[in-house]
UniProtKB/Swiss-Prot annotation:
<comment type="function">
    <text>Catalyzes the phosphorylation of hydroxymethylpyrimidine phosphate (HMP-P) to HMP-PP, and of HMP to HMP-P.</text>
</comment>
<keyword id="KW-0511">Multifunctional enzyme</keyword>
<feature type="binding site">
    <location>
        <position position="266"/>
    </location>
    <ligand>
        <name>4-amino-5-hydroxymethyl-2-methylpyrimidine</name>
    </ligand>
</feature>
<dbReference type="GO" id="GO:0005524">
    <property type="term" value="F:ATP binding"/>
</dbReference>
<keyword id="KW-0418">Kinase</keyword>
<dbReference type="InterPro" id="IPR022998">
    <property type="entry name" value="ThiamineP_synth_TenI"/>
</dbReference>
<comment type="pathway">
    <text>Cofactor biosynthesis; thiamine diphosphate biosynthesis; thiamine phosphate from 4-amino-2-methyl-5-diphosphomethylpyrimidine and 4-methyl-5-(2-phosphoethyl)-thiazole: step 1/1.</text>
</comment>
<dbReference type="GO" id="GO:0005829">
    <property type="term" value="C:cytosol"/>
</dbReference>
<feature type="binding site">
    <location>
        <position position="121"/>
    </location>
    <ligand>
        <name>4-amino-2-methyl-5-(diphosphooxymethyl)pyrimidine</name>
    </ligand>
</feature>
<comment type="similarity">
    <text>In the N-terminal section; belongs to the thiamine-phosphate synthase family.</text>
</comment>
<dbReference type="InterPro" id="IPR013785">
    <property type="entry name" value="Aldolase_TIM"/>
</dbReference>
<dbReference type="InterPro" id="IPR004399">
    <property type="entry name" value="HMP/HMP-P_kinase_dom"/>
</dbReference>
<dbReference type="GO" id="GO:0008902">
    <property type="term" value="F:hydroxymethylpyrimidine kinase activity"/>
</dbReference>
<feature type="binding site">
    <location>
        <begin position="50"/>
        <end position="54"/>
    </location>
    <ligand>
        <name>4-amino-2-methyl-5-(diphosphooxymethyl)pyrimidine</name>
    </ligand>
</feature>
<feature type="binding site">
    <location>
        <position position="177"/>
    </location>
    <ligand>
        <name>2-[(2R,5Z)-2-carboxy-4-methylthiazol-5(2H)-ylidene]ethyl phosphate</name>
    </ligand>
</feature>
<dbReference type="InterPro" id="IPR036206">
    <property type="entry name" value="ThiamineP_synth_sf"/>
</dbReference>
<dbReference type="GO" id="GO:0000287">
    <property type="term" value="F:magnesium ion binding"/>
</dbReference>
Amino acid sequence: MASNGHTLRLVINRDKHDSVIRGLYLVTDHDDNLIPRVEAAIDGGARVVQYRNKNQDRESRLALGLELRELCRRRSIPFIVNDDLEMAVSLKADGLHLGQGDGDPREARRVLGPGKIIGVSTHTLSEALEAQAAGVDYIGLGAMFPSRSKEVEHVAGSELLAAIRSSISIPIVAIGGITRDNGASVIDAGADAVAVISAVLSHPDPALAATEIALLFNRRAPFPRGSVLTVAGSDSGGGAGIQADLKTVTLLGSYGSSVLTALTAQNTRGVSGIHGVPPAFVADQLDAVFSDIPVDVVKTGMLFSAETIVAIAAKLTEYRRRMVVVDPVMVAKGGANLIDRGAVSVLKERLFPLAYLVTPNIPEAERLTGANISDEESMREAARRLHRLGARNVLLKGGHLLAGDSVDILFDGAAFHRFVSPRILSKNTHGTGCTFASAIATYLAQGDPLREAIARAKRYITAAIRLAQPLGRGHGPVNHILAAEDVRDR
């Protein structure tokens, strides 16, 4: 009893934010090896699984559904059956999704009970309002874009989604043609979840594809938004390495953690000494971070020795880190070698196959490939060679070319993309590579798809060079603070 004689009651307001319907909503396809592909997608961040199977006989559908249900229960993932109330009952599913006109949600509620999840497909505001009035737990809204899985009669689009979001209180699952590259627009319009099929299950690496889409939801998180772990050497001068990484991550609005691989005695004039951190202690640091702190993106820089690279690769594999940005730091601005001679081959063999993105500059790409790079065409060829080493994406930075704009080239295995900025003549460029790569990692962690993350990071590093102030008697650092303010104001 309270002192005034009134009983205190705990009142819980259950709104859409308490719903399990959020994030990446996976709808199954009809292809082979479904169970391992769905499990990989769950590893990558799928939060809900809908079982859709209209091709097999009932016995086969039931057997496969039981396998999926057990997988989802082991992983604490809601398991929803598509358009088959009897099947949902037989499988003891967590819920049922009904197409528009494919069943009565009130009858489904009566049969399944109040604790089950019921969703309905909608295409218009009136259908959405009707579904909410019928007591469903969420609506599916689509199609957002043309889809490969079926013929699209209604393209709802982001504008209708935004209008419906302001009119209903239950979660909205956007569906239809959603990919890594267009998913952000429907999340920004108000989708609580995005439903995908082929964008994940037809991908050669469903876990990575799921991670790419799941990360897009970080764009709605409060600041610090997203988490970046930098694995790199320390710069006592503060312009590069761990120091530059953490400045960038923090100033751009994410949470930064760090693992030190080496200590350097360094200033604007160069590196006078390097003390490598024992590989076992590098592994201990990685264990400490990964076992406790959520990490969305890992960024690596100076790794120093082959033994350290082996230790890092082992931990990235153990903890199933997929979003890894590898900046293959080899030489300091002043010319000092920052990696052992034998470590380069280990870097290519052990770390590149784990990389989501590698970001070499031209001298680094030449050392990694043995090619001579003198123009954009030779940059493209070098990017192809680097991609064949196993990295998912290669961003070859063209700042070392002497003429014209500063052009960076992204190769994703299928197409090239150019990122262009004016060339700025300045000797205050210490830490540019570290800063650029950590900015890309930060924007990825904040929910930007890859090309947008690179474009935003390119604007940031260009501003950091343009706004740099002289410091010391050598190559001064870029201006992290004013650059962050500059890109924030745009």
